[in-house]
């Protein structure tokens, strides 16, 4: 039952993050949908982790070159997701208020993704690996 509560909490926080992102795009003062391109960064951020988990066999090792490279790529993706709305606001494509809402949405969504892997990445009975 604890896994179901965690899944509901993660889906709720993901919905809050997407709400911030949509507010940054759809409010009448902002009205520009360029910040929706950060959804691409949200979708591809777990891919390096999936690849490293599939390729790396020794999960008890303290360090693995493949895992470190996956962390590096994931960090680059997350930094790009936070930098993209700032660049759009800097060149006056979007307003700074929309940038703030998109950055808040990014923070909530990436914390939700991290929480998902912390909760369901343990390999216990209620794990994301079984889905």
Curated annotation (Swiss-Prot):
Pfam families assigned: Vps55
Tissue specificity as recorded in UniProt: Expressed at the highest levels in heart and placenta and at a lesser extent in lung, liver, skeletal muscle, kidney and pancreas.
InterPro entries: Vps55/LEPROT
Membrane topology field: Multi-pass membrane protein
UniProt entry keywords in alphabetical sequence: Endosome, Golgi apparatus, Membrane, Transmembrane, Transmembrane helix
Single GO term (MF): signaling receptor binding
Locations listed in the record: Golgi apparatus membrane; Endosome membrane
Transmembrane segment boundaries: 7-27, 32-52, 69-89, 100-120
One Gene Ontology term, aspect cellular component: endosome
GO annotation terms (biological process): late endosome to vacuole transport via multivesicular body sorting pathway; negative regulation of growth hormone receptor signaling pathway; negative regulation of protein localization to cell surface; negative regulation of receptor signaling pathway via JAK-STAT; positive regulation of protein targeting to mitochondrion
Similarity comment: Belongs to the OB-RGRP/VPS55 family.
Subunit structure: Interacts with LEPR. Interacts with RAB13.
Function: Negatively regulates leptin receptor (LEPR) cell surface expression, and thus decreases response to leptin. Negatively regulates growth hormone (GH) receptor cell surface expression in liver. May play a role in liver resistance to GH during periods of reduced nutrient availability.
Name of the featured protein: Leptin receptor gene-related protein
